[in-house]
Amino acid sequence: MNLLVKCAGKIPALALTWTCRP
């Protein structure tokens, strides 16, 4: 999904926090 890509390029949003791994 593009969620991971957005996380890597942009700041992880509250909704994407679960999908984004620090």
Swiss-Prot record:
Protein name per UniProt: Protein YncP
Induction (record text): Expressed in both exponential and stationary phase in rich medium (at protein level).
Gene of this entry: yncP
Source organism (scientific name): Escherichia coli (strain K12)
Taxonomy of the source species: Bacteria, Pseudomonadati, Pseudomonadota, Gammaproteobacteria, Enterobacterales
